[in-house]
């Protein structure tokens, strides 16, 4: 691969990243995103070099740039994915692992899914959250989907960390897979202490027309905190038992009047 010398602007971005030394800062990510968009062969070359650097900060940045190169996020697929594959089996630094999880997700590496599922019990809640976010949503239209993906999501939706449960429940609510185990998991999450997780569970149960989800949903629609997902779940259920609570919401709920009107019509 012929590599052109880096431009002055590229050099400025790399130098700024070196100076900031903070992989979580917005300023660092402004430079990472800029380098991704530039997406030249010189950006690729520097990213690949940083991926093999002894410094975990550099490795994390290198992987983060490789994750989405070019305007379409998929430039230099062979070079980028080859490096990502070589790293997932050996990397031990937590920050680099989180960057690798994102790279596996954005590059759509199906061979990286077993590695993702292996991280579901990782002691770092940030890594478990990234796994819940990155796992492909199981779909019966794609029978090649690893069965372990669904099992991992079921495990993560019972994670002690709320944001992990939220993402895992979100994925379960969207999958077209259905089973008693999935329904029981969603019913459990419908009573979760976390508001967002409860909301995602309500939609998942509505998508499956699960009768046991209706009574709790009525209660949530009558509460003083009603999110759009609860109203969306009511629209999906289209059950007359939900209509009185929806009609009562017209007195004060102004988040999405059109959605509320559709839900009332569906339940009429």
Question: Where in the sequence are the language-model features?
Answer:
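Amphipathic alpha-helical scaffolding segments comprising HEAT/armadillo-like alpha-solenoid repeats
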Residues: 3-17, 38-52, 72-89, 109-121, ...
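Alpha-helix N-cap/helix-start positions at coil->helix boundaries
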Residues: 22-25, 56-57, 93-95, 110, ...
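Non-membrane alpha-helical segments in proteins
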Residues: 25-34, 48-49, 56-71, 98-103, ...
């Amino acid at each position: 691969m012929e590599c052109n010398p880096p431009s002055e602007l590229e050099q400025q971005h790399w130098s700024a990243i070196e100076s900031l030394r903070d992989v979580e800062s917005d300023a660092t990510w402004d430079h990472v995103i800029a380098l991704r968009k530039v997406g030249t062969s010189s950006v690729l070359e520097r990213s690949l070099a940083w991926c093999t650097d002894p410094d975990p900060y550099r490795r994390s940045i290198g992987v983060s740039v490789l994750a989405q190169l070019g305007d379409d996020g998929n430039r230099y697929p062979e070079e980028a994915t080859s490096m990502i594959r070589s790293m997932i089996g050996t990397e031990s630094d937590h920050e680099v692992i989180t960057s690798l999880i994102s790279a596996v997700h954005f590059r759509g590496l199906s061979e990286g899914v077993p590695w993702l599922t292996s991280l579901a019990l990782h002691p770092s809640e940030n890594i478990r959250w990234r796994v819940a976010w990155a796992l492909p949503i199981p779909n019966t239209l794609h029978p090649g989907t690893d069965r372990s993906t669904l099992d991992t999501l079921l495990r993560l939706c019972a994670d002690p960390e709320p944001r992990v449960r939220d993402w895992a429940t979100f994925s379960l609510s969207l999958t077209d897979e259905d089973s008693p185990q999935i329904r029981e998991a969603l019913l459990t999450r419908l009573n979760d202490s976390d508001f967002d997780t409860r909301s995602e569970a309500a939609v998942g149960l509505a998508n499956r027309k699960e009768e046991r989800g209706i009574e709790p949903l009525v209660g949530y629609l009558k509460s003083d905190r009603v999110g759009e997902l609860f109203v969306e779940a009511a629209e999906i259920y289209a059950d007359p038992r939900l209509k009185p609570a929806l009609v009562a919401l017209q007195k004060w709920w102004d988040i999405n009047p059109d959605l509320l009107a559709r839900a009332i019509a569906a339940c009429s």
